[in-house]
Amino acid sequence: MADFSYIVLDLEWNQPLNPDSAIREPFFFDSEIIEIGALRLDERFRETGSFKTFIRPRFYPHMNGDVVQLTKIRAQDLEKAPEFPRAYADFMEWCGEDCCLCTWGPDDI
């Protein structure tokens, strides 16, 4: 059995080019995850691993300029990236079973 670890998660999101074009049905969907980044820390908060994957956007495929400026993630970085289901499965496998997921804010939950 693997040792307990803390997983510190950071997500990056793309947004529609125009807020008026945000998906509203069947639910309000104003952004899409384009990167999962995480660090694994042991019980003494020492870094023991890292995870990073870009995610090819499905709903907002055109990069918002503000997002590019903030994250430095460009459309060409995402072209060959996995879509969310594959990236999520890879992340969950990397996390393992005995971990505590930590974030710095509500946008990463």
What are these regions, as identified by a protein language model?
Residues 2-109:
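Conserved non-catalytic scaffold segment of RNase H-like nuclease domains
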